[in-house]
Amino acid sequence: MFTSLDRNLYVDNHITLTKMDYQNTETIAEQERNASRLPQMFQMSSHPVALFFFLLFRTGAIVAYILGMFFTSSFMLLFIVIFTLLAVDLWTVKNVSGRLLVGLRWRNETGVDGESIWIFESADPSRPRNAVDQKTFWYALYLYPFIWIILGIVAIIRFEFLWLALVAVAIGLTSVNTAAYSRCDKDAKRRWATELADSNSSGFVSRFLSRAFIKRFIG
């Protein structure tokens, strides 16, 4: 038979265990949510494979750089690995990622007189857009050059000018698509606005002429 003291101890222990179980359940649930955010991002993407490779090469280059600072003595090997990753990233983003994720594409051609000509292409603005693809593309496009700039500042502080040269190459390769797609996006918005204005003007003129015709000949 329980005494009053035993009952109180039992209740206190039960409450303590209940709180611990609840906290553990919350912790596990939070860990599961955090673990599922990245896969969920790819699940919500319209082009998960393109999104994966869009992030893979540029992230791999930064990871290789940071690990190489501590775990390798072969700077030339590291330079080749990072340069290869960023070169593949440059081609992939230019020809695949931008077209699939945000409906934009750019290229640069040389004219007859040797002049550099930028050509921007964009998908139909009425095409359904995926918010995950859009946000990830634009955030990553500006974030990664910024990360390389920070790594460059660290190299300057540590007087590692050989590493700084590698960072300069990385900034150059990652900034090409950043600058090109920024111009491509502005050009697309300008053309869409012009086409919309022309369409509205044409519609206004058509309505005006129709009303004038009806009023003149029909009354």
Swiss-Prot record:
Keywords: Glycoprotein, Golgi apparatus, Membrane, Transmembrane, Transmembrane helix. The chain crosses the membrane at residues 41-61, 62-82, 137-157, 161-181. It holds the Pfam family DUF846. It is a multi-pass membrane protein. It is found in: Golgi apparatus membrane. GO terms for cellular component: endoplasmic reticulum; Golgi apparatus; Golgi membrane. Glycans are attached at residues 34, 95, 108, 200. GO terms for biological process: protein secretion; vesicle-mediated transport. InterPro entries: TVP23-like. The keyword Transmembrane applies. Its main location: Golgi. It comes from the Eukaryota. Belongs to the TVP23 family. Golgi membrane protein involved in vesicular trafficking. This is Golgi apparatus membrane protein tvp23. It comes from Schizosaccharomyces pombe (strain 972 / ATCC 24843) (Fission yeast).
